[in-house]
């Protein structure tokens, strides 16, 4: 039996990078995969086709998870169509990096709303269903930047640190109903976005990591799969770093 067979999973921000890798891995392990996106329709259609080709059910929803009502509406639709929500991966996120002296209110609000408010929105939306089921796994994508901070990323660091406190609080609130909530804190993950950066700078980041390489989206997806599955049934309220030993 596959690790996520008969489970319904929602992954936000899933058409590229870490989110895409998680959606693909969940499908490989038998999950029905529901995903959200805000940008490319073409990428979403390709992902949906790819997931369906794995022999599972899949569906994409286009909306901004920073908006509360669409999150509720989507979860209601998913429960009606697929019967449950067993796993949520709050992965959607953006950066608007700049020093505090140059940061606009808009840049602050945009990052906080997309990265942190969306986690509240989706968790609130699935709470009722998971409480009725007396089961569920909520996985929140934080960052090593949320653990240690980073110059030029005050907005991003605040949003990712907020996720850590939210995760612990939800684990305490919902644990008695067998609903688990954990956070993943990746460091330098090599994706399409990092591929556009200066290679010399990227190599300097790799050199600063004890394992001497950047992480791959699959490294994060492997942990998300573990946290989504029953293998992690006694793990909740934790922040698990995927950092190649950087914070050691």
Model-based region annotation:
Residues 179, 214-242, 246-247:
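C-terminal substrate-recognition "lid" of short-chain dehydrogenase/reductases
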Residues 128, 172-176, 233:
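Alpha-helical segment proximal to the catalytic Tyr-Lys
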Residues 143:
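Residue(s) in the substrate-gating loop at a strand-loop-helix junction
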Residues 29-46:
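Conserved glycine-rich Rossmann-like NAD(P)H-binding loop of the short-chain dehydrogenase/reductase
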Residues 99-100, 104-112, 194, 201, ...:
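Substrate-binding pocket helix/loop in short-chain dehydrogenase/reductase
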Residues 123, 159, 167:
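Active-site helix of classical SDR
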């Amino acid at each position: 039996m596959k690790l996520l067979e008969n489970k319904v999973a929602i992954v936000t921000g899933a058409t590229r990078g870490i989110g895409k890798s998680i959606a693909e891995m969940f499908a490989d392990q038998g999950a029905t995969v529901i995903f959200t996106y805000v940008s490319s329709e073409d990428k979403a259609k390709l992902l949906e086709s790819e997931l369906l080709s794995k022999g599972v059910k899949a569906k994409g929803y286009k909306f901004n998870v920073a908006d509360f009502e669409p999150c509720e509406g989507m979860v209601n639709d998913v429960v009606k169509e697929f019967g449950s929500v067993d796993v949520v991966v709050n992965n959607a996120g953006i950066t608007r990096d700049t020093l505090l002296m140059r940061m606009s209110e808009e840049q602050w609000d945009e990052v906080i709303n997309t990265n942190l408010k969306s986690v509240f929105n989706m968790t609130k939306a699935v709470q009722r269903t998971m409480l009725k089921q007396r089961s569920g796994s909520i996985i929140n994508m934080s960052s090593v930047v949320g653990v240690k901070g980073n110059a030029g990323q005050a907005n991003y660091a605040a949003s990712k640190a907020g996720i850590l406190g939210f995760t612990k609080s939800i684990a305490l609130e919902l644990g008695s109903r067998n609903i688990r909530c954990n956070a993943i804190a990746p460091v330098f993950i090599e994706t399409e976005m990092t591929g556009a950066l200066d290679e010399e700078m990227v190599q300097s980041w790799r050199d600063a990591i004890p394992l001497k390489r950047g992480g791959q989206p699959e490294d994060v997806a492997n942990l998300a799969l573990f946290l989504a599955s029953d293998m992690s049934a006694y793990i909740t309220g934790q922040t698990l770093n995927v950092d190649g030993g950087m914070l050691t």
